[in-house]
UniProtKB/Swiss-Prot annotation:
Keywords linked to the UniProt accession: Endoplasmic reticulum, Membrane, Nucleus, Transmembrane, Transmembrane helix
Cellular component GO terms, alphabetical: nuclear membrane; UDP-N-acetylglucosamine transferase complex
Topology Cytoplasmic: residue spans: 26-216
Record carries keyword DNA-binding: no
Principal place of residence: endoplasmic reticulum
Membrane-related topology note: Single-pass membrane protein
Protein name as catalogued: UDP-N-acetylglucosamine transferase subunit ALG14
Segments on the Lumenal face: 1-4
Organism: Yarrowia lipolytica (strain CLIB 122 / E 150) (Yeast)
Amino acid sequence: MVTTILIAASAILVLLLLRLLFVLPASNRFGFLYRPKHSNPKLMVMMGSGGHTGEMLRMLKTLKLQSYAKRVYVSSSGDVDSLEKVKVLESTTKTDIKTMVLENIPRARKVGQSYPSSVITSAVSFAVAVKLVHKHKPHVIVCNGPATCVMLCYAAFLLRFMALIDTRIIYVESLARVNRLSLSGLILLPFCDRFLVQWPQLAEKYPRAEYHGILV
């Protein structure tokens, strides 16, 4: 009986490991060659507040937002300014305002908050992020930091691991990061399908990082 249980547990563990290796972009060099095409693509964008929002808005201006059937903009709780700027951006493009959705999630860690206490706030942020990603099921998530975007990307990866969504994650490192990645970037590097940096030395230093010039 015990032997049977051990064999079954080992088999399940192996299957879970194989699933992880299949889903984890860092372990699958050909993973992003599979690009599912959707007739009604849905885009989710994390607005990171402050300078992060400024850089993201400049990148979004280069996209054909009208080609996305649904655009979900996510901000941290209390970040009203970022969402107002999104409304301005959407109003200047040829998009249907009805296909735009504004959401927010609790901050993973507030400014000046101690790391021990941030465990609870991060858990709450992650739980809300899971619910949000599962609700909208975006085909692509684009983010550029800070900490709260980690929760959003982790949520997407978990749901993808469970085969509940088929979402691709694109992370764009800040222009301010010249010689080394941000903490958010380091954490998310193995989990992103595309990881874009804006300085060539970063692409040389970090495997999987891509340099395609200044993006903002």
